[in-house]
Structure formats: structure tokens, C-alpha cells
A protein has these predicted regions:
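Electropositive, intrinsically flexible nucleic-acid-contacting patches
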Residues: 18, 41-52, 66-71, 86-94, ...
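Basic amphipathic alpha-helical segments that dock to polyanions
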Residues: 2-9
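A short, polar/proline- and glycine-enriched secondary-structure boundary/capping micro-motif
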Residues: 31-35, 42, 146-150, 280-281
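Short secondary-structure junctions
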Residues: 11-12, 76-83, 239-248
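Long, compositionally biased intrinsically disordered regions
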Residues: 137-145, 169-328
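Accessory beta->alpha helical hairpin/"wing" motif in late/C-terminal subdomains of nucleic-acid enzymes
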Residues: 11-45
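Exposed, interaction-prone assembly regions rather than primary DNA-binding/catalytic cores
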Residues: 49-146
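Well-ordered, non-membrane alpha-helical segments in soluble/globular domains
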Residues: 62-68, 148-167, 195-199, 275-282
Length: 328
């Protein structure tokens, strides 16, 4: 940072007792001269990201977006416009399939033009397209984010129409659109699991907008699990390892489960922290007054144990050993 500031590429900005860094004109020219196909999109014309955003809430929003890009980029997902198909462009999309994990920011999605006017009030950071599905991505930071059910449902509906029924209809089905929320720590996962939306019902809660809503942390552990979420082959290998000594779950059962203990105790693979699925599993166990087993990573265990209580037995996966085996 010091070297960039001395070179005149970064400048410090203070307002409302918050310090930030901004690209100087020299830095923008360097990026545009060196990689025009990558940075013209966001550094020229009347681009939204080229405007100064000095209000505290807008600066925090930009920080969360930048944090999202770092987490997703470190998971091996492609981010830059020149690396991916122009799926959301009004013109220029050639109908090519998405064969690798790619992320489109909310601003890129809004390139659709008139079709995107209905989602302007959404809190989503962008959309992750992976072989395993479409993930509408949010970053809640360290606390519950503001949430408007109808606004977020419009995002889901737009993706159904544009991706599942039009541009990528051969690749994705409507049931493959899921939610993904990033947070600073697993403590936020507990807040989400127990949230009722606040007094005005305007904070994030599991309101049924997505049947599957994954929670990942903005750290190395979250990055590795995100890479796993995008990789169906490695996910299948982990499931195979976890299934050793277990029998197949009952697909006809009303209870959410992935396997069963030899004595019939239902088992859920909860390592992706699919929060609605964990809620459904725990609720079913309570209604049936029976025990269950939840398998998760070691760093997720305390929060999930706190939420599920004594009825659920937790088995943990050593994250370090897992990473060494599947992501050496």
C-alpha cells in the first residue's frame, strides 16, 4: 500500500472518521493501457464504479462487494469480463455454455437493461454460475443484513427467466437456483438460523425464498468450501468417504437425510451449511421425537450444536485433513 501511494496510484480518503483508498487518475490509466479488455467496463464512461461514493453506508456496501470478490476469486472462480461469456449482456452473447465456475456482479446482471429494472432494490452482490447450480450471492458481513422478501424474489424470478428458460436453458433448471450468503464468522450463521426478521421484519431471515441457502465464511475455510461447492466430483468423493459404514437414506421419507446409521438413525451431511436444510432436519427430529446425526466441519460444530441441541449428535470433519486430501 505504501509503495502504491508513493507512486501516486492510490490516494487516501477520509470522511465520517472512516479511512478509505481510491485509485488515482494515473492508476486508472495504467489499468486501461495494460488491460483494456478487462477494466474498460468499470473505469470509463459513466460507469457506476467510477463515481465517488462518500456516504458511509455506500462505502460499507463497496467494502462488502470487494470482500465478496476476494472470497470468490480465492475459491478459483473467474471474475473478470474477458474471462467469461457475456451471459447478461444485452448483445454479444453467443449461446456458449458455462463450463467452469464464473461470477457476475450485480452490476453485470443489470446490463440486461429494462429486464433488470425490477431488481434495483435487491441486496444481492452477484450471481455465481457453477456446474452444481446457480447461486444468488449475498454478503451480510458481521450482522444480519436488511432484507425485502419481494425484492429478492424478483432476482430469483429474473434468473429463472433469463438463464433457466432462455440463455442457458440447456444447462440449468429452475430448481437449480439457490442462495449463498457470506459472513464474517459462524456466529452469524446462528443469528440467521434463529432470526425472525426483527421488529419490522426487514432483516434477513430464512423466509422460504430459497429451498437451499448456503452459508460460508469470508476466510480461507469458506474459500475452500466454496471451491468444493463448485466441484461435483470432489463433493461426490467426500460424500463417498462420509458414507462408509452408513446405509443409504430413505428417499421416500418425509425427513431430510443423506444416509442412516446401522440402527436407522437419520444422518445429514451438513458441511455446506445449507441452513434451510439443517432447519428442516432439526424440526423433523423434534416433531418425531427421535435423535439424528449431523456431519459438519470442526469449525462449524459449536454453532450447529448450539442451534440443534442435545437431540442431534454432531460428527466433525477435520478441516485440515480434508483440505490436505481433496485440495492439496
Amino acid at each position: 500500500m505504501t509503495a502504491l501511494k508513493k507512486a501516486g496510484l492510490l490516494r487516501t480518503y477520509y470522511r465520517d472518521r472512516l479511512r478509505g483508498y481510491r485509485l488515482g487518475a494515473k492508476a486508472k490509466l495504467v489499468l486501461l493501457d495494460g488491460w483494456p479488455e478487462r477494466f474498460t467496463f468499470c473505469l470509463t464512461g459513466d460507469a457506476e464504479t467510477n463515481r465517488l461514493k462518500s456516504e458511509a453506508n455506500r462505502r460499507f456496501r463497496l467494502h462488502r462487494l470487494a470482500e465478496t470478490y476476494i472470497t470468490i476469486g480465492n475459491a478459483g472462480v473467474l471474475l473478470y469480463p474477458d474471462e467469461k461469456p457475456k451471459v447478461f449482456a444485452q448483445t454479444g452473447f453467443g449461446g456458449e455454455a458455462v463450463t467452469y465456475p464464473v461470477f457476475y456482479s450485480s452490476r453485470e446482471v443489470k446490463e440486461l437493461g429494462a429486464d433488470a429494472t425490477q431488481i434495483r432494490s435487491s441486496r444481492f452482490a452477484g450471481v455465481l454460475l457453477a456446474p452444481t447450480g446457480i447461486f444468488v450471492t449475498y454478503n451480510s458481513g458481521g450482522a444480519l443484513m436488511k432484507w425485502r422478501y419481494k425484492s429478492e424474489l424478483r432476482v430469483k424470478t429474473l434468473l429463472w427467466n433469463i438463464l433457466c428458460q432462455q440463455r442457458l436453458a440447456q444447462q440449468y433448471r429452475v430448481e437449480q437456483v439457490h442462495g449463498l450468503v457470506l459472513g464474517d464468522s459462524m456466529d452469524l450463521a446462528y443469528q440467521i438460523l434463529t432470526s425472525t426478521g426483527g421488529a419490522k421484519h426487514d432483516y434477513f431471515m430464512l423466509d422460504g425464498s430459497y429451498d437451499h441457502f448456503y452459508f460460508l465464511t469470508n476466510d480461507h475455510q469458506g474459500e475452500v468450501i466454496l471451491a468444493l461447492l463448485c466441484d461435483p466430483v470432489k463433493t461426490a468423493e467426500l460424500d463417498r468417504i462420509l458414507s462408509q459404514g452408513l446405509s443409504a437414506g430413505n428417499p421416500g421419507s418425509a425427513m431430510e437425510q443423506d444416509a442412516a446409521e446401522p440402527d436407522g438413525t437419520p444422518v445429514l451431511f451438513g458441511y455446506f451449511c445449507d441452513l434451510p436444510r439443517i432447519v428442516r432436519f432439526n424440526t423433523a427430529l423434534e416433531l418425531m421425537e427421535r435423535p439424528g446425526t449431523l456431519i459438519c466441519f470442526d469449525f462449524q460444530a459449536d454453532v450447529l450444536r448450539h442451534y440443534c441441541g442435545d437431540r442431534v449428535h454432531l460428527q466433525t470433519i477435520d478441516f485440515t485433513k480434508f483440505e490436505g486430501r481433496l485440495f492439496p
